[in-house]
Amino acid sequence: MQHPLELGAAHYFPAEAFPDHRSHRYRSFMIEEILTDPPDAKGTAPPGELLKFGVQALLSARPYHSHLAVLKAEPAAVFKFPLAPLGCSGLGSALLAAGSGLQGGSASPHLPLELHLRGKLEPGGPETGSKAKKGRRSRTVFTELQLMGLEKRFEKQKYLSTPDRIDLAESLGLSQLQVKTWYQNRRMKWKKIVLQGGGLESPTKPKGRPKKNSIPSSEQLSEQERARDAEKPPESLGSPAEVSQEE
């Protein structure tokens, strides 16, 4: 009965590819004698004709220095990444150290990927600069008429609803965002003035939210003005005593 390993070897290799070990009688059970070829062997097949997983390839001793020779012969083919610093200290130093260890400090031709990574990693790159410029808002310069209209409306109405804000912005030639920002800043000053003047409680709740039912509408404001005008006493020409004295 033939050994299974020998059956597998016969399937992958012809009979003349390797010598027949059955005709050789071993003198001892030493590993060296088993692994070495018998003296009457005609010679093994070239390494290129054997597969990597064959019995002959596994038992044959191959020097590992050949792999090192391949690495030393073509260092640029093994390490094809740019070795110059890429702007990021951690990544650039690690790549530079690895490249100097493999190539002995010799510079390799830079790849186009380096320019792409530099733009991404450098803090002053074009993309970061454009984002920083977009985040800044130019300060709005109001005219005297616009400031007078805003102050006059703020005295009457500390908080604006969306329709009122739209009407005020259209009447003053401003945008809704400009009116909203001005009102927020003006309310902060107003709160400080109220607290500094002896007020025990802020006129609004935390986070700038007004109290319940504290935002009067335009109709309510007009009614309050009418009530104030009605409460004022009419201007008289003089008292009755003064009139009698004159007569």
Curated annotation (Swiss-Prot):
The keyword DNA-binding applies. InterPro entries: HD, HD_metazoa, Homeobox_CS, Homeobox_TF, Homeodomain-like_sf, HTH_motif. Expressed in smooth muscle cells of the upper digestive organs and their attached arteries and to craniofacial structures. Residues 118-138, 197-247 are annotated as: Disordered. GO terms for molecular function: DNA-binding transcription factor activity, RNA polymerase II-specific; RNA polymerase II transcription regulatory region sequence-specific DNA binding. It is found in: Nucleus. SUPFAM superfamilies: Homeodomain-like. GO terms for biological process: regulation of transcription by RNA polymerase II. It comes from the Eukaryota. Belongs to the BAR homeobox family. This is Homeobox protein BarH-like 1b. It comes from Gallus gallus. The gene is BARX1B.
